[in-house]
Amino acid sequence: MYETRDLTGNAGKPVDTNPWPNNSKIAVSFVVNYEEGGERSLLYEDEGFETFLTEAGLMPFPNRPVRERSIESCFEYGSRCGFWRILNLFKKHKVPFTCWAIGQAVEKNPVVVGAMEEAGCEVGSHSHRWINYEGVPPETEYEHIKKSVQAIQKASPSNSAPRSWYTGRASLNTRKLVCQVYKDLGLPQPFDSDEYNDDYPYWVADPLASKPGAEDDKGLLIVPYTLEVNDMKYAVAPGFCNSDDFYTYARDAFDVLYEEGLEGAPKMMTIGLHCRLTGRPGRFRGLQKLMEHITSKEGVWVATREQIAQAWSAKHPYKA
């Protein structure tokens, strides 16, 4: 995979047909990362405790295997409190989000899947563990992908498998392995979000095809994610110090894309959230203000990533 890079994209040209329903000027995708219970811990036979996106900031990985209860407890806030605070806000405004759900986290708290389905949200997969898959043997990563799909499907009241996929810290094997797992399980190919390189969805060749453009190349739809309009910047430097920083940055990004849509070039925007970060009251205010700003505008389509993928596929099908 990834033998070449595409540095051109649409070369600055808007798509010729508005892909969004009701002639919307922008498609907005909120994404809630549900990772609590899937992070590194000695409890899960890892070498040490989690050091990424914590309230303690970036810390060196411990030289000896220890448990750090303060970090574990901060993650637990996300599943016990933060998730529900965020979910209730979306229910109040009657708009959906897509969840990147870690399979192991879902196994440890399956009730969240039913709650999201009941609220009309989409439960996508974030793989089985919240770890870096670079260097993980392909056979191990394959099993993790399979476990994640099965964990989410088991927790789903409708027995739904995830249709959207985002590993995050992916390996060069991830994309092909995900497609292979879905094929082996008899499931339709998912939509891939392990890219950050466009304001539009776009197609790539099917990783399982004999070769690009061959008869068996059905294409793979990429729905790009974001590390930019993302509350992870509360925990990395340079980043957001308070909820006003988050709100101002996300609002400005929305306003620029919304203006481009009004001028005839409707785009999509993604906003990444984490239960243990934005779920804290002091940061939550920024999300409240952003939600009010976005939902006050005409011609805004707040959608799940599956809905965005379906809309794009209908107007812009794959051309091998």
From Swiss-Prot:
Cellular compartment(s): Prospore
Presence of the UniProt keyword Metal-binding in the record: yes
GO CC annotation terms, alphabetical: ascospore-type prospore; chitosan layer of spore wall; cytosol; nucleus
InterPro entries: Glyco_hydro/deAcase_b/a-brl, NODB_dom
GO MF annotations in UniProt: chitin binding; chitin deacetylase activity; identical protein binding; metal ion binding
Function description: May deacetylate chitin. Required for spore formation.
Protein name: Putative polysaccharide deacetylase
